[in-house]
């Protein structure tokens, strides 16, 4: 079972050696170049999956690579977009760029001064 062995599935060393010899996988050069899940699904080298990042409750046993889920790529791109926007807004909080709140604060500080100036001419 080489690199394709599931992390949750435990086998002894003897069992795994027997399975490898039965499968005819004595030459593992291609398996060592890929990640542990890539050789299992036949993904091209260098391609990974965004699996396990967000799992809705009750959806643990659903295979997202099956043809029943045609919107998988659009869901991934939506997830990436949402996370990117959150990250970018989070990063702006500590930046030195002026935010939209500063002009409002300046107006509030100036308004009592203007009101005070308007009251003086009325008195005199």
From Swiss-Prot:
Region called Disordered, residue ranges: 1-77, 90-124
Top-level taxon of the source organism: Eukaryota
Acidic residues bias locations: 11-30
Tissue-level expression: Expressed in Testis.
Ranges of Basic and acidic residues composition bias in the record: 1-10, 34-50, 101-124
UniProt protein name: Testis-expressed protein 54
UniProt source species: Homo sapiens
């Amino acid at each position: 079972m080489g690199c394709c062995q599931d992390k949750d599935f435990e086998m002894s060393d003897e069992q795994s050696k027997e399975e490898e010899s039965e499968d005819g996988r004595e030459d593992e050069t291609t398996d060592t170049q890929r990640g542990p899940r890539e050789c299992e699904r036949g993904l091209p080298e260098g391609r990974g999956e965004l699996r396990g990042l967000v799992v809705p409750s009750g959806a643990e046993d659903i295979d997202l690579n099956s043809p029943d889920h045609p919107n998988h790529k659009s869901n991934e791109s939506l997830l990436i977009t949402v996370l990117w926007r959150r990250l970018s807004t989070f990063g702006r909080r500590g930046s030195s760029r002026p935010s939209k709140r500063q002009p409002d604060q300046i107006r509030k500080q100036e308004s009592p001064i203007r009101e005070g100036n308007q009251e003086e001419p009325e008195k005199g």
